[in-house]
């Protein structure tokens, strides 16, 4: 797995089992990027790219909100800032680094990471 630091985030990239194409490569971009490594995720043809969160309760929520349970952190509401960094710094660097095909790019995540991807 390739590990990069782009913007303020750690990025993990796992190449397809068939290797990178000579032309453009399809990709799946995932929030909670550490799951690619933890779950040993693989694909046959797409590059898996995971963005590791700095603070998922802040970065993956669209507005600030108090915690649901006492003793747990509040939701920070920094999704707009996270998306600006993703779109303006991280994604362009990944497109250049791995020749990603912007027409074949999926974006998703798990739980709050999925909310952030909508």
What are these regions (language model features)?
Residues 1-118:
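Non-catalytic cap/lid and distal C-terminal segments of serine-dependent acyl enzymes
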